[in-house]
Amino acid sequence: MTEIIDGKALAQKLQLHLANKVEQMKEKHGLVPGLVVILVGDNPASQVYVRNKERSAIKAGFKSETICLSDSISEEELIEIIEGYNQDPSFHGILVQLPLPAHINDKKIILAIDPHKDVDGFHPMNTGHLWSGRSMMVPCTPAGIMEMLSAYHVDLEGKHAVIIGRSNIVGKPMAQLLLEKNATVTLTHSRTKHLSEVTRCADVLIVAIGQGNFVTEEFVKEGAVVIDVGMNRDKNGKLIGDVNFDHVAQKASLITPVPGGVGPMTITMLLEQTYQAALRSVTK
């Protein structure tokens, strides 16, 4: 029988535990973890994500600040704002919401963030730490998926994990985290030939390509664990994943829904990494 992974319930449980840790930090060190989220422009999806992050941060007892900037801001002005938060000891996490307007180079912006405050885990220094097995800040979605797999007692050792999507945000860091758990990893992408033949070999299938209902039951072997990272809208405006949930759930042993699966865990790991950054600031 298929079990649905309840990412929302798990996230709530972990955030409650995190709130207790924050309270202990206040009592022991007189310190409150600080997170600033910088939003450029008025992308509706980004606005929703940012509101959810701020709401969760405040609920967990964090100092939370959201900076909303015009999409006409220059690259230099944005970097200057980031530099200010790099120097501010009351903020331990800095997140610049992507995507950015076309005239701003997102690589330059990521480089401008202090790696010790880069709670998205996108700075090249943190990427290097991840691939050398000494990770400090890890991209939040892969980190959240690993937490989910652990909570649902998915043993990864020796298992074949297939990832659809090779982005720097999900696919590539996901591969490294799975390798660290001794899984055998196949990273597929838009140029992979005979994709469904590859994915049917997967004990664990992670899908992050941004195409609604792309993965159907023919991509999945019986009893596989299926993690859907996709967030898409169908023609009626309904939120759907990259996986055709109704069809694939008939074959999977474990599957994440959309919404209520990976998304809440991404925010949870963002908060956890901000907390850890704050903790390092008083224990270094």
Swiss-Prot record:
Q: List, alphabetically, the Gene3D superfamilies matched.
A: Leucine Dehydrogenase, chain A, domain 1, NAD(P)-binding Rossmann-like Domain
GO MF assignments:
methenyltetrahydrofolate cyclohydrolase activity; methylenetetrahydrofolate dehydrogenase (NADP+) activity
Q: According to the lineage, what is the superkingdom?
A: Bacteria
Protein's UniProt keywords contain Amino-acid biosynthesis: yes
Gene encoding it? folD
Whether Membrane counts among this entry's keywords is: no
Q: Which GO terms describe its cellular component?
A: cytosol
Question: What does the sequence similarity comment in the record state about its family?
Answer: Belongs to the tetrahydrofolate dehydrogenase/cyclohydrolase family.
According to UniProt, the reaction catalysed is: (6R)-5,10-methylene-5,6,7,8-tetrahydrofolate + NADP(+) = (6R)-5,10-methenyltetrahydrofolate + NADPH; (6R)-5,10-methenyltetrahydrofolate + H2O = (6R)-10-formyltetrahydrofolate + H(+)
- Family matches, as InterPro entries: Aminoacid_DH-like_N_sf (IPR046346), NAD(P)-bd_dom_sf (IPR036291), THF_DH/CycHdrlase (IPR000672), THF_DH/CycHdrlase_cat_dom (IPR020630), THF_DH/CycHdrlase_CS (IPR020867), THF_DH/CycHdrlase_NAD-bd_dom (IPR020631)
Query: What name goes with this protein?
Result: Bifunctional protein FolD
Q: How does it assemble?
A: Homodimer.
Provide this UniProt record's keywords sorted from A to Z.
Amino-acid biosynthesis, Histidine biosynthesis, Hydrolase, Methionine biosynthesis, Multifunctional enzyme, NADP, One-carbon metabolism, Oxidoreductase, Purine biosynthesis
What does the UniProt record say this protein does?
A: Catalyzes the oxidation of 5,10-methylenetetrahydrofolate to 5,10-methenyltetrahydrofolate and then the hydrolysis of 5,10-methenyltetrahydrofolate to 10-formyltetrahydrofolate.
The regions listed as transmembrane in this protein's record are none
| Pathway listed | One-carbon metabolism; tetrahydrofolate interconversion
- GO BP annotation list: L-histidine biosynthetic process; methionine biosynthetic process; purine nucleotide biosynthetic process; tetrahydrofolate interconversion
Q: What is this enzyme's EC? A: 1.5.1.5, 3.5.4.9
- Disulphide bridges: none
